[in-house]
Each structure stands twice: as structure tokens, then as C-alpha cells.
Amino acid sequence: MTQHSPYSSAIAEQRNQEWLRFVELLRQAYAEDLHLPLLQLMLTPDEREALGTRVRIIEELLRGEMSQRELKTELGAGIATITRGSNSLKSAPVELRHWLENVLLKNA
């Protein structure tokens, strides 16, 4: 049995608050058309590339035409990354999944 210390709970809460602060900052940046410079400031080129790859993974998983192995070859992503994307998509709220289908697959 694993016990969670108050210290680890406090750290988790602090990290969650920092994440929510970033999300709010990004929302404000979009409202003021500063989102691209903000994201370029906050993310390295590798992180931006990884996010683009993750969008492609979700898109292809939603499309359902390729196996995870085919996605690995097509995108050059690790099988673990694709599996995490698949697991995250399975646990995503239905509303989010429908929204993603509408946005990512509308031109398919």
C-alpha cells in the first residue's frame, strides 16, 4: 500500500495551480492575439514539434485507418507515445472526443 505524504499532495496541488495559471495566461494571450509569441517563448522547438506530433497521433487514432504500428512508422513516434495517446483518448470526456472529431476530421 502506497501512502501519500502531505508534502507530495502539496506539491501536486502547487503543480496543478501552476498549470491552471499557464492555461489562463494562454487564454489571455489568445484574446490579445499574442498566443504564438507566448508559445514560442514558453516551448522549445522540440516541445512544439512534440505537440504537433501528438495532434497527428490523436487525429489518426480518431480516423481509425492505421494501426498503432503503422502510426509509429508514419510519424516516427515511439510506440509508447502512441499508446499513451490512445489511452488518453479512451479516457477523454465524450464531449471533448466529439469536438476533436469535428475539428480534426472535418476536412478529411
Curated annotation (Swiss-Prot):
Gene3D superfamilies: TrpR-like. Its main location: cytoplasm. This is Trp operon repressor. It holds the Pfam family Trp_repressor. The gene is trpR. Belongs to the TrpR family. InterPro entries: Trp_repress, Trp_repress_bac, Trp_repressor/repl_initiator, TrpR-like_sf. One of its GO terms (cellular component) is cytoplasm. Keywords: Cytoplasm, DNA-binding, Repressor, Transcription, Transcription regulation. It comes from Salmonella typhimurium (strain LT2 / SGSC1412 / ATCC 700720). It is found in: Cytoplasm.
